[in-house]
Amino acid sequence: KVMESTLQGKDGSEKVYVDYYGKVLQIGEDSKEDPVQGNNVYLTIDKDLQIACYKVLEQKIAGVLVANIQNIKTFKADENTDASTIPIPIYDVYYALLNNSVIDIDHFTAADASETEQKIAAALERKQEEIFRKVDEQLTGSDTKPYKDLSEEMQGYVSYIVNDLLMDKTGILSETSIDKNDETYKAWTKDETISLQEYLTYAASQNWIDISKFSDKNTYLDSTEVYQELSAYISDYLSTDQDFSKMLYKYLLLDDEITGKQLCTVLYEQGVLSTDDEDYQNFKAGNLSAMDLMLHKISSLEITPAQLALDPCSGSVVITDPSTGETLACVSYPGYDNNRLANNMDTDYYRKLNKDLSTPFYNKATQERTAPGSTFKPVTAIAGLSEGVITDNDYIYCGGRFDKLQGAPLNCWLLSGHGALSIRDGIANSCNVFFSETAYRLGQNAEGTFNDNTAMQQLIKYANLLGLDKKSGLEISEASPQVSNELP
């Protein structure tokens, strides 16, 4: 967008006079204006480096996935869970094939659907009957349950109905109309002590429901009639809602009503994977499990991190020339082929990208705002040296963790510790304890009392001096940087 005005030239023109049939009778004298060519734009990007970075990034992310996939169904992290030890359940991988449309679930009911696809479709139909009945009980039954007393599965369905269907997708439940201080609203959102029926009935009585979104009746409807119409609308909507169906698939997998083996079979049947390889023969013969097949295919990038849209599924690489500041590579993964969106737009391709859970339209290199991690350590080093809290001759001892602040201690990536480190050693080893201690000293006063705001202001000062509070100036959409205002 930014460079378009530079590239774009000016059309030429000429005034002509024509008769009724369009025949040129006369060309206006001195009316001709020659076209003006647009200006050239010169990129600093190294094409080969850009391509290489994309490939390396994809391989690295795939490697992280493979290293963390475990043969488990679910995993729940808590506040004490070390992020570096969080596994990826293989059932999440199977579900991702459906959830991010790697597998075409619409083909399950096609005339030429395979036997495996038909079995999966039949399992979904049974599940739909079961869940629609349970949802209807919560909407219209006489024995409804408070949200907190529902099963985790039913809580997921009910939350989807309220948050996704009624609010995000249709706008029936109006965000602007809801009184967030209302006691019934709090009972639903915070205390979870009322049922779906109670909440929506109350919402109808308070005019939080926009009836024009689902009813074309011109007559006045009281709150009871509004709720009856709304309940019927919800049931009808869910019956054709693909996103809701995908939720059902998740629990079909967890209940082993459909299997990873079936989904891997469908990958071959739908042409996502090629049957012309050794893995297919081993899988077909029963010598290769569904999990091992997925690990093989992720490793070989026949199934990519972008397709699965698990965590992690994205990344970025920016390489600059330190001598000139020129950008040599600016890579966001996953990307897309923008040639298919120019001139004659490929609308099917656009829709696919727009629904892709790995968000390919979002440029991670220029728009993602996240903690910089170890790349910020040189800033801490500069601040420490400049403020005199460390010197070139000082040594800081790393025993594997930093525990001078309240709360959970911060572990170094080397749990056994690095021992005594100089500033050079601290940078070379990217030691968490060394730089935590440096930041801690930045927040101490003359008496040795620590103040976290003082430490933060010192770090912010040097981050700003180094220009980290400003955009880079790349000629593409770029998020404004935001230096943190609190300690992690």
Region roles according to the model:
Residues 5-8, 49:
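Intrinsically disordered, low-complexity regulatory segments
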Residues 16-34, 45, 66, 70-375, ...:
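Beta-lactam-recognizing serine transpeptidase/beta-lactamase-like catalytic domain environment
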Residues 39-49:
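Conserved beta-strand/loop elements of the cytosolic catalytic core of P-type E1-E2 ATPases, chiefly
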